[in-house]
Amino acid sequence: MFEVNPVLNKLKELSERTELLRGYLDYDAKKERLEEVSAELEQPEVWNEPERAQALGKERSALESVVATIDVLTQGAEDVEMLVSLAVEGEDEETFHEAETEADALEKKLVDLEFRRMFSGQHDASDCYMDIQSGSGGTEAQDWADMVLRMYLRWGEAHGYKPELIECSDGDVAGIKSATIKFTGEYAFGWLRTETGVHRLVRKSPFDSGGRRHTSFCSAFVYPEIDEDVEIEINPADLRIDVYRASGAGGQHVNRTESAVRITHIPTNTVTQCQNDRSQHKNKDQAMKQLKAKLYELEMMKQNAEKQALEETKSDIGWGSQIRSYVLDDSRIKDLRTGVETRNTQSVLDGDLDKFIEASLKSGL
């Protein structure tokens, strides 16, 4: 005979946690708003304003993910309880194992939804950009920056965030000097915001004929894409705009014609670049959008006394602002903020970052 009580206890706990989430996440208000948004999207005239229609579509998707998940959890718990009853009545072990599997799947959905409660920041639901910059150290540091770029591209692809290489500047011999990735999808900024900081690599360098250990640094800076209606005053006189030929390491992702655009905001020395379109005009628009988003995020960071000052975040590519250490010849990667550690270095470099990101979010970084 099979053990029924553990499954029934799990279902009871799942139902209680679902009810708590129903309150925390304002289920009733979201369901009502979902009906309003869906009704508006059914009106033909809404498509006369493509930007508004797009914003409503995005809002509907976010609302559906909460409302539908809570509905699935509520109905699912009842369905599994019925499966357990049928299994007991018919002494059917196969049906009972099906109930156990369903209960485990429901628990995973619930844990995912509970985790998303941590995405309560103003821009957590937004798309985002990540700037990657190699530190001092020449070819070794530039190769490390390229490895970090690949790691985040892999992470983004695995999570359905459609990573797009906006800009990429080749290293002198190998690797890259800098790159910008755009991540598009729900809660992209929420997931990646704690990845801002310095990544430290220790390894026997393939570029050193003596095979000596080298330490290299690379910084990542994450900032959300902001809505067009957010007012960011940028004086055109404060901008320097340069046009150049794209020369990135992005292969087919990066355009090679002389239409790449670099914009420098002189008062803050903030730089954005775009080279992924054949149109100089489109690249300039994209670079301006990035600049606006970057200046906004930097202003938010300045206003938040709990965060590091902009100068520390941007200029100290060294020991002080490290977030993670990658010691490859010792097969050890450790997050210096949360203490999370793994010896599966290749998996992490292939984009398996969730254990680190989840721990940093849970610790409130």
Curated annotation (Swiss-Prot):
Peptide chain release factor 2 directs the termination of translation in response to the peptide chain termination codons UGA and UAA. The modification N5-methylglutamine is found at Q252. Belongs to the prokaryotic/mitochondrial release factor family. The gene is prfB. Gene3D superfamilies: 3.30.160.20, 3.30.70.1660, Release factor. InterPro entries: PCRF (IPR005139), Pep_chain_release_fac_I (IPR000352), Pep_chain_release_fac_I_sf (IPR045853), PrfB (IPR004374). This is Peptide chain release factor 2. It is found in: Cytoplasm. One of its GO terms (molecular function) is translation release factor activity, codon specific. It comes from the Bacteria. SMART domains: PCRF. Keywords: Cytoplasm, Methylation, Protein biosynthesis. NCBIfam families: prfB. The keyword Repeat does not apply. It comes from Tolumonas auensis (strain DSM 9187 / NBRC 110442 / TA 4). PANTHER family: CLASS I PEPTIDE CHAIN RELEASE FACTOR (PTHR43116:SF3), PEPTIDE CHAIN RELEASE FACTOR 2 (PTHR43116). Pfam families: PCRF (PF03462), RF-1 (PF00472). One of its GO terms (cellular component) is cytoplasm.
